[in-house]
């Protein structure tokens, strides 16, 4: 996690509720990750909604360190078409940190969509070109993981609702001829 995702929702950056909500959001993230079987993660708590005020090199270094330590072959990042500026910055910094040099293991980079963020960029839409078929157990696991984010969970027709998640999975499934799917945009694929 690059940004803390909480402070930008407050008018006063010194509001004492920020710390309380930040702790709750971090706990939500941990519970969500654990429900998916993820046990290795980092929280960097850079200021939410203000990544444009952080030197890009600092964010690049965070990501380069993670890539060096983890040595992934596949990296997933936010979409460059996202309405959220922090997400677009993370996308750019990911591409910088994942440059194809001899000490990097990355073969593929994908961007993903985030409900209530990616689909609202009407002038520059997310264009998926890679689809991953899901079954009902995958969808249930995804919804369960999201259920821990009580600060993000909304009622339908908001996209960040349980029905919103299911609707997107069914729509992406229709696009590729299956019941359920997730959609990604392949940014880079090295077969070397």
Question: Which ranges hold each PLM region?
Answer:
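ATP-dependent adenylation/pyrophosphate-handling site
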Residues: 1-18
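Active-site loop/turn elements of alpha/beta-hydrolase fold enzymes
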Residues: 2-4, 45-48, 114
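Conserved nucleotide-sugar phosphate-binding/catalytic loop shared by glycosyltransferases and other
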Residues: 17-48
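Metal-dependent de-N-acetylase/amidase catalytic core
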Residues: 34, 40, 49-192
């Amino acid at each position: 996690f690059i940004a803390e995702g909480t402070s930008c929702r407050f008018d006063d950056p010194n509001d004492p509720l920020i710390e309380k909500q930040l702790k709750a959001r971090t706990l939500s993230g941990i519970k969500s990750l654990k429900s998916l079987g993820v046990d290795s993660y980092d929280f960097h708590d850079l200021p939410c909604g203000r990544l444009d005020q952080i030197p890009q090199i600092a964010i690049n270094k965070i990501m380069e360190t993670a890539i060096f330590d983890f040595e992934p072959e596949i990296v997933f990042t936010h979409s460059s078409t996202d309405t959220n500026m922090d997400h677009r910055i993370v996308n750019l910094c990911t591409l910088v940190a994942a440059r194809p040099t001899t000490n990097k293991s990355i073969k593929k980079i994908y961007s993903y969509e985030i409900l209530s963020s990616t689909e609202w960029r009407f002038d520059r839409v997310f264009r998926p070109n890679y689809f991953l078929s899901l079954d009902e157990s995958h969808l249930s696991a995804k919804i369960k993981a999201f259920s821990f984010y009580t600060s993000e969970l909304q009622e339908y027709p908001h996209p960040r609702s349980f029905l919103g998640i299911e609707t997107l999975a069914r729509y992406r499934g229709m696009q590729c001829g299956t019941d359920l799917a997730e959609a990604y945009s392949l940014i880079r694929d090295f077969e070397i």
